[in-house]
């Protein structure tokens, strides 16, 4: 159990603005070991270190080429040389790098799931074997290393199949194959992301997620969320790339009981604690199929806070340190949308702080490469459509401010 006197927190990962903001809002001293080094994160933190050093007229590079998880260790060590930090809060990016998590945890304790617990829910296909034992719906999954083995497994599972890297996040490198010919072609594309590949039965349905909090013996669903994947109007180039979310999921009432059962069974069986997420596909029969666990803060963070009017970092600390979960008050139904925008071409970015709803804001006059993250937008409204249309309208305005840049 953590010492209850936690005052300073280090946010670590690639999606930190909302997490750092939530921590600062309730009085914590906030530090960050970040990837992008965005403008709004700099203004929140006492001190931060980032992989990318954003500068006017300089490219922010390409994530898939520049992302190296071990760099977060170096950034953390650098911050610890001059600052006293009590605990780490994890965002996305390091879920599948268990050695890195262990080393981070040795430097500063991770407030939340231990590296061993993270490994137990992220190591596939062992995790899916446990789900089968628990009777939790999930797509049939196998790990392969070559296309011959992939074809054999796909024939046994039955087409269509999903091909994905065994390690990754944000839907990067995920493909669908409807035949052995497609499998051969798509397999080579996925190999770029990882040498170990998952072949998974494709479940046709709506992409969703569960956000929940857990203490050592109690689990509470916060929200069921709609996931936005591969949305064309955000210029996301990956077919299953994460483009944001809408909270809550529009048909949440039809699946809430099943989702509660799934979250409780998984959290208690694996010993999950604090803020966690479960990615799902909801079939046409309204059966939630578990796709993966996100055993740390999720990209839905600010939307969940807006809908429930809670502070998620405070709730996470209370769950992990004190063992209690927040009371949920009945409120008027609010919908909150987060859109992640990607560069439609190589662009020069203006000052995006003029957009109140913009988050993850790059420094003015930096260069963003085609298909790379540009910024995100968070809106809310009394209906799903109003919230989404508001976000799309702001996205259109932001895209209108960008200036194309040549590759010279």
Please tell me what each predicted stretch does.
Residues 1-122, 126, 133, 145-152, ...:
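ATP-binding N-terminal substructure of ATP-dependent carboxylate-amine bond-forming enzymes
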Residues 137-139, 160-162, 174-209, 224, ...:
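Conserved ATP-binding module of the ATP-grasp superfamily
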Residues 204-208, 212-271, 294-318, 330-331:
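ATP-dependent carboxylate/phosphate-activation module, predominantly the ATP-grasp catalytic core
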């Amino acid at each position: 159990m953590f010492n209850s006197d936690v005052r300073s927190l280090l946010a670590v990962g690639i999606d930190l603005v909302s997490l750092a903001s939530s921590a600062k809002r309730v009085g914590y001293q906030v530090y960050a070991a970040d990837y992008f080094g965005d403008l709004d994160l700099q203004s929140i933190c006492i001190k931060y270190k980032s992989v990318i050093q954003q500068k006017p007229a300089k490219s922010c590079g390409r994530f898939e080429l520049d992302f190296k998880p071990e760099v977060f260790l170096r950034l953390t060590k650098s911050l610890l040389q001059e600052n006293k930090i009590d605990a780490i809060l994890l965002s996305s990016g390091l879920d599948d790098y268990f050695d890195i998590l262990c080393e981070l945890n040795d430097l500063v304790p991770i407030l939340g799931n231990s590296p061993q617990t993270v490994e137990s829910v992220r190591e596939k296909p062992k995790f899916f074997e446990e789900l089968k034992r628990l009777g939790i719906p999930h797509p049939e999954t196998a790990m392969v290393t070559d296309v011959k083995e992939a074809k054999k497994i796909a024939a046994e599972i039955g087409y269509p199949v999903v091909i994905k890297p065994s390690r990754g996040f944000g839907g990067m490198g995920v493909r669908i194959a409807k035949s052995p010919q497609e499998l051969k072609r798509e397999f080579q594309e996925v190999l770029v992301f990882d040498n170990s590949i998952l072949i998974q039965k494709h479940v046709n349905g709506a992409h969703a997620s569960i956000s929940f909090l857990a203490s050592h013996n109690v689990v509470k669903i916060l929200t069921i969320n709609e996931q936005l994947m591969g949305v064309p109007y955000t210029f996301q180039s990956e077919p299953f790339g994460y483009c944001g979310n809408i909270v809550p999921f529009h048909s949440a009432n039809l699946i809430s009981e099943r989702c509660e059962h799934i979250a409780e069974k998984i959290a208690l069986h694996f010993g999950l604690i604090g803020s966690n997420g479960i990615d799902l596909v909801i079939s046409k029969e309204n059966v939630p199929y578990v796709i993966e666990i996100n055993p740390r803060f999720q990209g839905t963070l600010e939307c969940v806070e807006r809908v429930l009017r809670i502070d998620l970092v405070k709730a996470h600390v209370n769950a992990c340190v004190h063992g209690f979960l927040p009371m949920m008050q009945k409120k008027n139904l609010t919908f909150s949308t987060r859109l992640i925008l990607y560069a439609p071409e190589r662009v020069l970015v203006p000052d995006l702080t003029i957009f109140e709803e913009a988050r993850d804001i790059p420094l003015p006059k930096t260069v963003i490469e085609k298909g790379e993250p540009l910024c995100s937008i968070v809106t809310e409204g009394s209906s799903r459509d109003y919230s989404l249309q508001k976000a799309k309208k702001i996205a259109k305005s932001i895209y209108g401010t960008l200036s194309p840049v040549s590759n010279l």
